[in-house]
Structure formats: C-alpha cells, structure tokens
Amino acid sequence: MALNLQDKQAIVAEVSEVAKG
C-alpha cells in the first residue's frame, strides 16, 4: 500500500480537522 505525499498530506489534514471538531 503506497500513498503519494500529496495524498498523505490531504489525509493528515482531514484527520486533524476532524480531531479538532
């Protein structure tokens, strides 16, 4: 399972926003 750097960044950003609420 390989993710592109952009995809990884996007996922991290989404998770961060969700975590913040």
Swiss-Prot record:
Signal peptide: none
Annotated keywords: Ribonucleoprotein, Ribosomal protein, RNA-binding, rRNA-binding
Coiled coil, from the record: none
Role: Forms part of the ribosomal stalk, playing a central role in the interaction of the ribosome with GTP-bound translation factors.
Family designation: Belongs to the universal ribosomal protein uL10 family.
Quaternary structure and partners: Part of the ribosomal stalk of the 50S ribosomal subunit. The N-terminus interacts with L11 and the large rRNA to form the base of the stalk. The C-terminus forms an elongated spine to which L12 dimers bind in a sequential fashion forming a multimeric L10(L12)X complex.
Name the record gives this protein: Large ribosomal subunit protein uL10
Species assigned in the record: Proteus vulgaris
Upper lineage: Bacteria, Pseudomonadati, Pseudomonadota, Gammaproteobacteria, Enterobacterales
Encoding gene per record: rplJ
